[in-house]
């Protein structure tokens, strides 16, 4: 989902609550690097995912960079038609999206 074509990464609420400082820095950096079309300033509802428990139980600030957008079909947030299906495989990896996320995270890590 971090490498799907036309991915959109909003600021997910659990990430904002527990790792907001890092989330804002990474999203700002993504925009600065020219990837604002991926790293959106919009807020998304909370997700229960691995980062939820790492934040709550281990108390390690962790954020989720995940394609999470409003579906034009259901008008609700979803992960795309490929999520948890046989279509969720390497064939849907979009190199420009993967470059945007990878370059943004690596630039942040090497410059923190």
Regions found by a protein language model. Give the residues of each.
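Active-site-adjacent substrate-binding region
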Residues: 2-112
């Amino acid at each position: 989902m971090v490498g799907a074509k036309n991915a959109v990464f909003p600021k997910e609420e659990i990430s904002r609550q527990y790792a907001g400082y890092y989330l804002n820095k990474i999203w700002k950096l993504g925009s600065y690097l020219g990837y604002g079309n991926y790293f959106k300033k919009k807020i998304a509802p909370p997700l229960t995912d691995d980062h939820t428990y790492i934040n709550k139980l281990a108390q390690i600030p962790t954020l989720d960079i995940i394609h999470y957008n409003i579906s034009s079909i259901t008008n609700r947030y979803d992960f795309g038609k490929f999520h948890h299906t046989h279509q969720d495989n390497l064939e849907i990896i979009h190199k420009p999206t993967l470059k945007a996320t990878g370059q943004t995270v690596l630039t942040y890590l090497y410059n923190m």
